Amino acid sequence: MKVKICGITHPDDAREAAKAGADYIGMIFAKDSRRCVSEEKAKYIVEAIQEGNSEPVGVFPEHSVEEILAITETTGITSIQLSGEDILFKFSQLREHFSIFYVVSVYSNGQPSAALPPMNDAVTVVYDHIGGERGSPFDWKAFSPFQHNNWMLGGGVNLWNIKEGISLLSPRGIDVSSGVECPGILRKDIFLMQALINSAKELSSSTL
């Protein structure tokens, strides 16, 4: 079970997430996000996890191919998460250069908003609740993932519902942001991160 802690805004939080066993550390570059980080801050976050096993992921919902290439070169980010209206074009241009997380937005009723293009299992599909930062899950019981083995469950995952999500859907990974945050300050709660990561790993082992 892979775990991505997304919306990291501080190097200390990245370091603690890596120590807790997070496989991926996500940084958001969307200007309209409360969790948006600058290139300078992202560089510090990448440096904070260099000695561990966590992989830095840049979240790019609105940037051009050229902007993504420039930011990743400046920051040292090695994986990218793509979403937005021109996702197909960006995916075709960047898939040979990066490990890619491909976002499929899901409506509250559990229905995906778009079809999945042809891709191999090297690409990680992330199912996220439309609205992104609402912090609530879509209808997991009504949801059925596409025929693609490597996928993550996102959108409202937290310590209190992770068991249900893994039991119902058996994802290859989970993607969590607000579910491990300290209320009101957009910093991560160390103990919530540790508990959620431990739960994810234990639950995935018990379902094998």
Swiss-Prot record:
Gene3D superfamilies: Aldolase class I. Pathway: Amino-acid biosynthesis; L-tryptophan biosynthesis; L-tryptophan from chorismate: step 3/5. InterPro entries: Aldolase_TIM, PRAI_dom, RibuloseP-bd_barrel, TrpF_fam. It comes from the Bacteria. One of its GO terms (molecular function) is phosphoribosylanthranilate isomerase activity. Pfam families: PRAI (PF00697). Its EC number is 5.3.1.24. Belongs to the TrpF family. HAMAP family: PRAI (MF_00135). This is N-(5'-phosphoribosyl)anthranilate isomerase.
